[in-house]
Amino acid sequence: MTLYIRREASKLWRRFCSEITTEIGLLAENWKYLLAGLLCQYIHGLAARGVHYIHRPGPTLQDSGFFVLPELGQDKGFISETVFTCVFLSFFLWTFHPFIVKSKKIYTVLIWCRVLAFLVACQFLRVITFYSTQLPGPNYHCREGSELARLPRPHNVLEVLLLNFPRGVIYGCGDLIFSSHMIFTLVFVRTYQKYGSKRFIKLLGWVIAILQSLLIIASRKHYTVDVVVAWYTVNLVVFFLDKKLPELPDRTTALLPVISKDRTKEESHKLLNGNGVDPADRRPRAQVNGKDSNGGHTDNATNGT
């Protein structure tokens, strides 16, 4: 038993080291895209913080979802946040499964480049939308009479740039259309739908996305229109952007993605060694009439003809 555990642990460690080497090479080539995506996440948070300064509380708007779904109450608002946290952590961990699982379809660096591209495109549209029209927030801390509904003028620039994290992120107001939680949820679900392998988890992801939508409305964190707009906007953005982005390499084959630096080195090595001919041109030719086309002269010499 101990020998089996050691052997499996050794295999796992070799697989982990091999994956680390591959991912470091991909990171060296794609780090600027990841950095730009993370920077845009901060800019999105900065925009959401900025709209809170101009938010003005008022009567909650008439909403069909509020009539259909009973109000959960302020003490149960954590339920939707818990569901979202589970979705986020599950997807995050899944993107790192190639480091330990033998069967894999994705590269961690490349999948996050793709996911961040989807998120940034959706968040760009979201910022334009909630700055175009400021609606009175339906959340409890955004209603009239709440001290958090209006933000006082900032005392310094750092107060704005630091976003008053994490309190300023949790108790934001004014960034309504469309739901940021639904952007992340739908992007994650659609990504797993394409690159995941478990059919049950794919179905479960869509069920959780629907449940998350209902919980957001029942918690009065967003109007129904915020959730509805998120559903068709995110799906359309991902659909069209997915066709424009280069497809991920297929990991079902034994070939690794060729990094441009390695490709240049390989081509230079071939030229220096006089191996510029495609190796495919050197493969043995098929026999014709019982004679090898490459070795025709040799065979003739051997036979004395």
From Swiss-Prot:
Transmembrane residue ranges = 34-54, 81-101, 105-125, 169-189, 199-219, 222-242
Q: Which GO terms describe its biological process?
A: sphingolipid biosynthetic process
Subcellular location, in the record's words?
Answer: Membrane
GO molecular function per UniProt: inositol phosphoceramide synthase activity; phosphotransferase activity, for other substituted phosphate groups
Q: Write down the membrane topology.
A: Multi-pass membrane protein
Q: Name one Pfam family in it.
A: PAP2_C
Family annotation (InterPro entries): Sphingomyelin_synth-like, Sphingomyelin_synth-like_dom
Q: Which UniProt keywords apply?
A: Lipid biosynthesis, Lipid metabolism, Membrane, Sphingolipid metabolism, Transferase, Transmembrane, Transmembrane helix
- EC number(s) recorded for this UniProt protein: 2.7.8.-
Which intervals of the chain are annotated as region Disordered? 266-305
Name the organs or tissues of expression. Answer: Expressed at low levels in roots, leaves, stems, flowers and siliques.
Q: Which domain of life is it from?
A: Eukaryota
Biased composition of type Polar residues is found at: 290-305
Instruction: Note whether RNA-binding occurs among the keywords.
Output: no
Q: Which family does it belong to?
A: Belongs to the sphingomyelin synthase family.
Q: What does this protein do?
A: Catalyzes the transfer of the phosphorylinositol group from phosphatidylinositol (PI) to phytoceramide, an essential step in sphingolipid biosynthesis.
**Protein name according to UniProt:** Phosphatidylinositol:ceramide inositolphosphotransferase 1
Q: Taxonomically, what lineage is the organism? A: Eukaryota, Viridiplantae, Streptophyta, Embryophyta, Tracheophyta
